[in-house]
């Protein structure tokens, strides 16, 4: 009888904690005596992870913040690698956080430990040479999106497309009436969700632009109402300051982006992961983004993809309008969004097809792929 499995996982932020806990749960169903080590958040700890240190120590955003903590991050990684080599788990699974986990995978694979990376970094879009490090350090890549899997197949990296957990949790048809009732919005009133991003810099660059656009929409459609989910108390305070002196009928929500998307007819949205949520809720959208001019100039030369938004990358065509940098003016955004409030059927038909492709029971698919790599029976 084979010995109980020992699986090491490292997640670096809240989204990875969600993915990791779902994978752990699916693995335990198949092998109840499994043991988990590594680094995880509260959800992974609830599934039985013995975390070597708090996951929050890895949750660092921004170049300046990373540089300020670089010595600590490198020391933690070095100690973690040594601990895992001594423990000799059956497999190591790095969940997202590529700048931290890819190096661990490379060192562990050289030490004879099988490695899996769950959630592809955006190597298909920029810094494509990272795929060389992935090919050397990774026995298996698990991707959430199908076009990522095609890229790795072309690059000779073993890969499995497992689907996206959000596509599993968001229903194919959302309850618009229930969401509106919960927000106190009339069923017949047209509603636009404003989603200028979750980070302070994004809201600073896009918040005023989105409110200028809302004023132009309101001038053409006086019965229009707006909802804006705020990612944190800090973002809410920032948004409230940007709204001062404006007379806009906007309902601010604390979090609850899913409620805002379920309730609305169309979305004005910053490019980012929230566009996938909007797609899964089948809400017509216009994508906008602005960066510092130098940053935009550099990225424009580095990025290999013709599109920036996930809906277009998934559709492999221009399914949703993208207005970037100087093209993102209030007049252009309002003109593009207005017809979608009443009729976004072309977009939503494409969204429905993509949702069905992504809806693959991701956690169970990932668990089966990991167990197949180990030569263990994945069947229940």
Curated annotation (Swiss-Prot):
One Gene Ontology term of the molecular function aspect: lipid-A-disaccharide synthase activity
Keyword Lipid biosynthesis in annotation: yes
State the name under which the record lists this protein: Lipid-A-disaccharide synthase
- Origin species, per record, is Pseudomonas syringae pv. syringae (strain B728a)
**What reaction(s) does this enzyme catalyze?**
a lipid X + a UDP-2-N,3-O-bis[(3R)-3-hydroxyacyl]-alpha-D-glucosamine = a lipid A disaccharide + UDP + H(+)
Q: What class of enzyme is it?
A: transferase
Check the record and name the PANTHER family matching this protein. Answer: LIPID-A-DISACCHARIDE SYNTHASE (PTHR30372), LIPID-A-DISACCHARIDE SYNTHASE, MITOCHONDRIAL-RELATED (PTHR30372:SF4)
Recorded E.C. number(s)? 2.4.1.182
Superkingdom to which the source organism belongs: Bacteria
Checking InterPro entries in the record gives: Glyco_trans_19
The gene designation is lpxB
User: Lipid metabolism: present as a keyword of the record?
Assistant: yes
Matching entries from Pfam families are given as:
LpxB (PF02684)
Q: Which stretch is the leader sequence?
A: none
Name the protein family: Belongs to the LpxB family.
Q: In which pathway does it act?
A: Bacterial outer membrane biogenesis; LPS lipid A biosynthesis
What's an example GO cellular component term for this entry?
membrane
């Amino acid at each position: 009888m084979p010995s109980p499995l020992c699986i090491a996982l490292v997640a670096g932020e809240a989204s990875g904690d969600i993915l990791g806990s779902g994978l752990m749960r699916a693995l335990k169903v198949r092998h109840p005596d499994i043991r988990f080590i590594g680094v995880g958040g509260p959800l992974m700890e609830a599934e039985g992870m013995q975390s070597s240190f708090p996951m929050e120590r890895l949750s660092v955003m921004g170049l300046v913040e990373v540089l300020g903590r670089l010595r600590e991050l490198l020391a933690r990684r070095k100690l973690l690698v040594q601990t895992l080599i001594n423990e000799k788990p059956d497999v190591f699974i790095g969940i997202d956080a590529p700048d931290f986990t890819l190096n661990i995978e490379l060192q562990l694979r050289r030490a004879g430990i099988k490695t899996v990376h769950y959630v592809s970094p955006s190597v298909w879009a920029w810094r494509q040479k990272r795929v060389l490090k992935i090919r050397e350090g990774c026995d298996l890549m698990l991707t959430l999106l199908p076009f990522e899997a095609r890229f790795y197949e072309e690059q000779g990296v073993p890969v499995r497309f497992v689907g996206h957990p959000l596509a599993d949790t968001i229903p194919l048809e959302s309850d618009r009436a229930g969401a509106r009732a919960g927000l106190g919005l009339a069923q017949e009133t047209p509603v636009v969700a404003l989603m200028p991003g979750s980070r302070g810099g994004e809201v600073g660059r896009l918040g005023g632009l989105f409110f200028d656009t809302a004023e132009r929409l309101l001038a053409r459609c006086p019965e229009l109402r707006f909802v804006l989910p705020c990612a944190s108390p800090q973002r809410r305070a920032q948004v409230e300051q940007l709204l001062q002196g404006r007379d806009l009928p906007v309902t601010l929500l604390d979090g609850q982006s899913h409620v805002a998307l379920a309730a609305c007819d169309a979305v004005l949205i910053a490019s980012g992961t929230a566009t996938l949520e909007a797609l899964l809720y089948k809400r017509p959208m216009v994508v906008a983004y602005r960066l510092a001019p130098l940053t935009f100039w550099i990225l424009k030369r580095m990025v290999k993809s013709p599109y920036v938004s996930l809906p277009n990358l998934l559709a492999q065509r221009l399914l949703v309008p993208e207005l970037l940098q100087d093209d993102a003016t209030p007049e252009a955004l309002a003109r593009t969004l207005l017809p979608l409030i009443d009729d976004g059927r072309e977009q939503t038909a494409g969204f429905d097809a993509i949702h069905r492709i992504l809806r693959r029971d991701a956690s169970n698919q990932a668990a089966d792929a990991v167990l197949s790599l180990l030569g263990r029976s994945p069947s229940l």
